[in-house]
């Protein structure tokens, strides 16, 4: 008789025995996502993360997560002019069950961009890297379209190359002026009503009439060293960094406790 291995016995179990299925959500916790105080609605939503287990800490798994939220949801407004603007928020600190976020970028929805592009006009784009007073380096993208004059009988409204260059230069000048003299909080407050784009449209009217001028995208290229106190100021909670360094000891340097004679 040939001697061989019994595959059924080598596996050490009966055929057809299924492993116990454990629901992965039983090992997770819900955390509330908080937006900075620049927005009227602070409670953005909730996010899941695995509980702290061994060396894997739950708060470390949350830091760095990016949440994309519509401006209409952040401002609790049903205005259609706000719904196409998306803000990105990055988790920087976990306070209890709250995830405190900071501004991480802005973008327009694809359908809004496609709707703005039309025939018989000139599309003008500009982008520039600027630094805020509190150390954030932002790349700001601006877009605009030429508009037909009310007295013109032409079907088209194309701008000349010299006019396009002049408009692009004016866009960069206004963006640099408004961002370099402001902190990140003030820049976000300008992006919410899109006041920078309105200034550009007024300033460029003498060169060529424009329409649908807007800040298309904002990227955060570089951010300063993380400070909990500054993040708490963004969230309207002053003194958040208190107690981070601990209480100062009143004992002098080189202090040695006295030797006890009896225990």
From Swiss-Prot:
Residues 235-263 are annotated as: Disordered. Keywords: Cytoplasm, Ribonucleoprotein, Ribosomal protein. Its main location: cytoplasm. It is found in: Cytoplasm. Component of the small ribosomal subunit. Mature ribosomes consist of a small (40S) and a large (60S) subunit. The 40S subunit contains about 33 different proteins and 1 molecule of RNA (18S). The 60S subunit contains about 49 different proteins and 3 molecules of RNA (28S, 5.8S and 5S). HAMAP family: Ribosomal_eS1_euk (MF_03122). This is Small ribosomal subunit protein eS1.
């Amino acid at each position: 008789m040939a001697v061989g291995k019994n595959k059924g016995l080598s596996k050490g179990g009966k055929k057809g025995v299924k492993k116990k299925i454990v629901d992965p959500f039983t090992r997770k916790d819900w955390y509330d996502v908080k937006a900075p105080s620049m927005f009227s609605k602070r409670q953005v939503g909730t996010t899941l993360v695995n509980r702290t287990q061994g060396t894997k800490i739950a708060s470390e798994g949350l830091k760095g997560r990016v949440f994309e939220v519509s401006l209409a949801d952040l401002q609790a407004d049903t205005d259609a002019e706000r719904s196409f603007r998306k803000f990105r928020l990055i988790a920087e600190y976990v306070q209890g069950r709250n995830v405190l976020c900071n501004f991480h970028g802005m973008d327009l929805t694809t359908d809004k961009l496609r709707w703005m592009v039309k025939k018989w006009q000139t599309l003008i784009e500009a982008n520039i890297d600027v630094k805020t007073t509190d150390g954030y380096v932002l790349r700001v993208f601006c877009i605009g379209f030429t508009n037909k004059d009310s007295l013109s009988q032409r079907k088209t409204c194309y701008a000349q190359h010299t006019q396009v260059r002049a408009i692009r230069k004016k866009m960069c000048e206004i963006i640099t002026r408004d961002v370099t003299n402001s902190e990140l909080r003030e820049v976000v407050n300008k992006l919410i009503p899109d006041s920078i784009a309105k200034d550009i449209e007024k300033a460029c009217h003498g060169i060529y009439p424009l329409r649908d001028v807007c800040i298309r995208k904002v990227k955060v290229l570089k951010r300063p060293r993380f400070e909990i106190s500054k993040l708490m100021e963004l969230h309207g909670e002053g003194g958040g960094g208190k107690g981070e360094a601990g209480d100062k000891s009143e004992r002098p340097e080189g202090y040695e406790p006295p030797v006890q004679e009896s225990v």
